């Protein structure tokens, strides 16, 4: 794993030692090269799962998430260039340092084998994200958003720390492999139920589960572009990853405890999709759509069948790329119109025809059109839910319908209609932006040719 961690750490001196006009080129090139390293981890067979080291190892669940994390850093750097064009060089370097340190802690979180180390790194990701949101956001409300983000996550995570210490006292080890192999059966007593809640609550806040999701729209709306991208694409997946790691340790109690949470996520999925239909703020709409997509993942993980785990992993990767792409598109609109209100940016199709193509493709991937991996993930989860209970098909089917509606609503309000007066002197789309959109879309479409590499343990 060091062959991935050390080059990423070396991005820090590269950033600070580069000349001012070379910062973007150097960091983008270096981070693109780093993003090819996780591809080496793909050819592991299931037999030598933990073959790396005692501290860091990768397996079929963490490798796709590592690929997503490393692929996202060059894209974030490319997306931030216009946003930081008026900042002094030291401020640009500090911003990049925050992104890189976030990347390092994410890589180490996805590969940690000790649960306490996983917990510490899980919390470490808060600090750079908080700095990015509260320092580089656009509106004064960003401080409020930062407080929400910090307190929701910390209050959710404290019970997890206590539960981990309790487990360590009783079992003497917190190695994930050992715990999975030697886990005691948890009976459904009050104390065990509370421990189950303590274990899962941190991840449910992070996912976020409906009801614990209020920090997400605030944080997304106020964050700068790179903050929104990494928050939607990778930080939400930390919750799913943690749940998939820890749920097998908590059996058979999960079978009893999962019902209210599955119901809540199915209900929340429809509620947040419906909320999307009456949003006027573009970034807020994309944030709520993230909540509804991740609700499916929560339900899938709690069912605990191989198919639902496959669907959850695929859906996490697909959603990471799609929502990041949507935030990039929203940001390109924001940089031109200086407003997030959708109606004010209507009729952009006539002014930026190529951007309209990216908008169309992004909307279609968001509503899970074949042959994208979004469809594969949703179908796997749908079938797993259906075999768990037939009635769920009504809720998931309704959710698919509403998702289609709000995706097309988002597309038509921003692209169709008559252009408003303040969009007359608009800049054309830059090559950098088109490349950025293409680099988001190409993995979504290409992975549909060989989806087994992001399907997790089932393959």
From Swiss-Prot:
It catalyses: a ubiquinone + NADH + 5 H(+)(in) = a ubiquinol + NAD(+) + 4 H(+)(out). It is a multi-pass membrane protein. Its EC number is 7.1.1.2. It comes from the Eukaryota. It is an enzyme of class 7 (translocase). It is found in: Mitochondrion inner membrane. One of its GO terms (biological process) is electron transport coupled proton transport. One of its GO terms (cellular component) is respiratory chain complex I. GO terms for molecular function: NADH dehydrogenase (ubiquinone) activity; ubiquinone binding. The chain crosses the membrane at residues 20-42, 60-80, 94-110, 113-133, 145-165, 196-216, 224-244, 257-277, 284-303, 308-330, 341-361, 391-411, 437-457. Keywords: Electron transport, Membrane, Mitochondrion, Mitochondrion inner membrane, NAD, Respiratory chain, Translocase, Transmembrane, Transmembrane helix, Transport, Ubiquinone. InterPro entries: NADH4_N, NADH_Q_OxRdtase_chainM/4, NADH_UbQ_OxRdtase, ND/Mrp_TM. Core subunit of the mitochondrial membrane respiratory chain NADH dehydrogenase (Complex I) which catalyzes electron transfer from NADH through the respiratory chain, using ubiquinone as an electron acceptor. Essential for the catalytic activity and assembly of complex I. NCBIfam families: NDH_I_M. Core subunit of respiratory chain NADH dehydrogenase (Complex I) which is composed of 45 different subunits. Belongs to the complex I subunit 4 family. This is NADH-ubiquinone oxidoreductase chain 4. It comes from Pongo abelii (Sumatran orangutan). The gene is MT-ND4.
